[in-house]
């Protein structure tokens, strides 16, 4: 099982890139991008708490005496990105759009700040695993800041392409996370200790992440097309026709 939802080789990072991680959370993608190539990695989120966690985690990965790469994080909304047009070479938006009512406006903002020919990697919960969670627990999607919709991947692709993108790849991720969320929804508790099945499966996920045994990596790879929790898509921003304004 991988910590990352986005596969970085599909982003095609090159030295000097500027990358935006929109809704970076605790920094898993923004920090990894910083470590992979001499780029400027920018992470934004609405949660000050998550950004503080990102700062703390980054100290473990900071590369001293290397001015060719940087990580910048700040509070900002995807509905009004504080960046000029055509600022970024790559944009990541992982597990974010399902939290936003007006997600199409966020996609339009991503298109605005991404350079022509730039790559946009995004993920949302896959329809069936998410549908089961909603059926098992109302509280799952009624919590403050929770999921406001279940996406149909084909419809979402159409929305993104209408904004001026072309999809070039797709895969699924985190199949081993699905039983955890189904158990959590089945034994939902608003407060206090989680039910035993939830605790034990969480321990398994942590062990798997830290130990990375070949068996579970193989299982995750085999099961992802069938029941991966996330659907991940990669798009390129179309260049404007000759003579049009960028």
Predicted regions located by residue number:
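Alpha/beta-hydrolase-fold catalytic nucleophile elbow
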Residues: 123-124, 173
